[in-house]
């Protein structure tokens, strides 16, 4: 893990731990319904808490939107060049197609972000909050590492193919 990634992930960890103090809150509009208030458009202001924006640089950001009974966390994965943009897009599409396996993963991310998670009070009741935070932090580390490894492999493969192609022209 790079030295600049460690403080970024630490800030995300502490912010998530603070935001995941969720409680059961019934809907104010529909009886016997409990819906994530952060997902409801035009919800009352007292149910939404102050959003937190944590940025490592202009290309890597986290938006944590807490409410009284849910937290939506959106990640912008690093996309320094066109290759990384393509890799991140393919990688996140692959994960979003398997959203059922990740209980907290949203199928469609917030516009401007690569991937989003939705954690409700039911998730914090059935799973340990510390383990949820650990999963998200480990997920962020793994995505960063995977994108870097795939990019290195892709560049090595392109170099090999270019050398093989150019060897045809050497006499």
Curated annotation (Swiss-Prot):
Keywords: Actin-binding, Cytoplasm, Cytoskeleton. Gene3D superfamilies: 3.30.1460.20. It comes from the Eukaryota. Its main location: cytoplasm. GO terms for cellular component: actin cortical patch; actin cytoskeleton; Arp2/3 protein complex. GO terms for biological process: actin cortical patch organization; actin filament polymerization; actin nucleation; Arp2/3 complex-mediated actin nucleation. InterPro entries: ARPC2/4, ARPC4. GO terms for molecular function: actin filament binding; molecular adaptor activity. It is found in: Cytoplasm, Cytoskeleton, Actin patch. Pfam families: ARPC4. Functions as actin-binding component of the Arp2/3 complex which is involved in regulation of actin polymerization and together with an activating nucleation-promoting factor (NPF) mediates the formation of branched actin networks. Seems to contact the mother actin filament. Belongs to the ARPC4 family. Component of the Arp2/3 complex composed of ARP2, ARP3, ARC40/p41-ARC, ARC35/p34-ARC, ARC18/p21-ARC, ARC19/p20-ARC and ARC16/p16-ARC. Present with 9020 molecules/cell in log phase SD medium. This is Actin-related protein 2/3 complex subunit 4. It comes from Saccharomyces cerevisiae (strain ATCC 204508 / S288c) (Baker's yeast).
